[in-house]
Amino acid sequence: MLEIKNLQKVYGIPGVSAKPALNGVDLSVGQGELVGLFGENGAGKTTLLKCVLGLLGYAGTITLDGEPVTRANIARLSFATCEHSFFPHLTPAGHRDFYREPFPRWREKRFQALMDFFRLPMNKAPGSFSTGQKNQFEVILALSQGADYILMDEPFAGNDVFNREDFYKVLLGILEPTETVVLSTHLLEEVEHFVGRAVLLRAGAVVGDTSVLELEERGMDLMAFVKSAYGYEPDRVSRALDRLTEEGEEETP
């Protein structure tokens, strides 16, 4: 169980230029869950994932099966980030050899199968890959480390819709019952049939947490749930257009 209690993160200097990013987040994620983490830009999604990984300092507690996340259990977590964590000049074959030692549960068969699926070359430096290929390689590494909890932050930015759709199908087929995925993305419709649970962040706080099954029973899809939790105004577009096209609008000389 990944447990987050009263998680708080403030950027800047308190009392001078402080900017709250997380405000008392409470969240529990059990092994085997597929969780979608949603929210507008600046909601705190990336900050939350980085706090879990120990990449940022924070107030509150984060534990794995009751133990704090330390060097002793960090291998139970992996991270795929659109900021990229791989070595740009080390080939995929070199990454495989490098990762085998610190990650004793390295999944060689999965690594090779995903490299073949995305048609990525084993002996070409990933720094020369396209943006989409770099993100693919980042995801492959995260899925091959043998981690129990796989955290993903906008993993398929720069990838076409066909690659994304096919990959989610492959992912559902290869994940073991004990593997957990926490996926941060804006692509709600694409992941609706992949995730089993939706967690919504807004201004650094959890404003919604439900299972996709519960939404279906309520006759709602994921987009409707997000709009409801966010208080979305359906007439905002028409109001903006009315203002922009109203007669007598002053023209700039």
Task: Please give the residue ranges for each predicted region.
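The feature captures the beta-strand-to-loop junction immediately N-terminal to the Walker
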Residues: 38-40
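Conserved ABC transporter NBD signature motif
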Residues: 60-73
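ABC-family P-loop ATPase nucleotide-binding domains
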Residues: 81-137
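Catalytic Walker B motif of ABC-type/P-loop ATPase nucleotide-binding domains
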Residues: 150-154, 159
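Helical segment within the ABC ATPase nucleotide-binding domain
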Residues: 164-177
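ABC ATPase nucleotide-binding domains
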Residues: 213-253
